[in-house]
């Protein structure tokens, strides 16, 4: 069965369409109007092994906040829909991602109890034209809407680009493990409750 989903969300602030195939090859077409954010989402798709299409039109004349946060919301919703009740997946995943002087780790639990632990510090307020505080907004929106407990921590690192990108890659690699089909579950949700 194909694990794909498409979600469309339109508000007065943003119009967003996300399509994802969890069992893809890492191909992506991303258009958010924010160059660095596009780069991060392309990296997320590539390292997660997800085929991903994102089309976002936001109120960038105000700032980037709505565009970044709302795209995280819709991406999380699309992945959750594609997971179909978390049936048959491994549920847990983790990754350590080095990027030159930076090392970031992510642990994820597809528990349907969303939570974000964020231990990431940036030495500069911007990378490219993007405010670095928006990376937490993305990860929070994503975790809340995919239904995942996400712990993301940069252990060390100086370069702002590397800190941001290693975070997206760590999330992608951890999620890639968590969404893998586990034949031992027999197609059921991996929980003693029988449902997530």
UniProtKB/Swiss-Prot annotation:
The keyword Lyase applies. It catalyses: D-erythro-1-(imidazol-4-yl)glycerol 3-phosphate = 3-(imidazol-4-yl)-2-oxopropyl phosphate + H2O. It is found in: Cytoplasm. Pathway: Amino-acid biosynthesis; L-histidine biosynthesis; L-histidine from 5-phospho-alpha-D-ribose 1-diphosphate: step 6/9. InterPro entries: IGPD_sf (IPR038494), ImidazoleglycerolP_deHydtase (IPR000807), ImidazoleglycerP_deHydtase_CS (IPR020565), Ribosomal_Su5_D2-typ_SF (IPR020568). One of its GO terms (cellular component) is cytoplasm. Keywords: Amino-acid biosynthesis, Cytoplasm, Histidine biosynthesis, Lyase. It is an enzyme of class 4 (lyase). HAMAP family: HisB (MF_00076). This is Imidazoleglycerol-phosphate dehydratase. It comes from Caulobacter sp. (strain K31).
